[in-house]
Amino acid sequence: IGLCLVGSEMCIRDSRTTGEIFETPQVAYMMIAATLFSKYPAKKRMAYVKAYYDAISTFKISLPTPVMAGVRTPQRQFSSCVLIETDDSLDSINATSSAVVKYVSQKAGIGIGAGNIRAIGSAIRSGDATHTGVIPFYKLFQSAVKSCSQGGVRGGAATLYYPIWHLEVEDLLVLKNNKGTEDNRVRHMDYGVQFNKLMYERLITGGNITLFSPKDVPGLYDSFFADQDTFKELYEKAERMTSIRKKTIPAIELFSNFVQERKDTGRIYLMNVDHANTHGAFIEEVAPIRQSNLCCEINLPTKPLSHCLLYTSDAADELCR
């Protein structure tokens, strides 16, 4: 079974028409080693190639899909997972969608940090329009993820992260279940729900969790990751303010909904953002952890993409920053 899996998904083949496989797994291992060390000095190169081949062909080193399936092809990309964060603007959302398509096409799994998008009904341009909510944009990201087949190796996949206190969280928790319609479900991504100590304290003490739109409480979303004391101060102050749109829900009810959806649908991850920052390799005040990857297994600092600039000149293609 393993041989068939490697041969059908990782070996070079004619994926468009006949499906003919052009190499065996051992040839693939040799080509990977030869490609990776092709720029090394000629006197040392073969020794490195052989040592690396011996390590990967005997499974002492496990290779991620982009390396295993694509590093010996013209489209070389070494990142197995890419973390992409969006801000609360159309330019940033479009830049994120563009980046998702680019990296999915290069066989990467995607982690999307999308918790900062304002909630449905929020004012846009000082009330010139009202926000449609996060679900239409999650659908956009889902379409971007599923737009490429990754060369027939595997379908695109992504996990999208948002905080448990987001104003739309009750609708977000059910995005994967089989109830509802296509209009209010986004089933083909996975989700990571983000918690911190304050949320657990509300649960343990039988308290409530107050839901906000991130846009309505400046600094709340950033401090959720970078400074727990500041987050608690802003959160409790916002709870007392009558001018801020909010919704209060018993913590036990919200946690129960999360657990039920996680049990029923699978792959709804729990991310403790305070522990991710205090127990990691990065300084939270300088480079806070704001999301994880496709499998919710790594912590790397991110910053939101600002916008994509598209050029029509022959000298420039696309710039995301």
Regions found by a protein language model. Give the residues of each.
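Single conserved hydrophobic/aromatic residue that forms the stacking wall/gate
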Residues: 1-7, 12, 311-321
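Active-site cavity-forming subdomains of large catalytic enzyme subunits
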Residues: 79-309
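Acidic/polar, glycine-rich intrinsically disordered N-terminal extensions of enzymes
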Residues: 8-9, 13-78, 84, 232, ...
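Conserved helix-loop functional segments at active or binding sites
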Residues: 14, 38, 58, 62, ...
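Short, intrinsically disordered low-complexity segments
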Residues: 12-15, 186, 289, 320
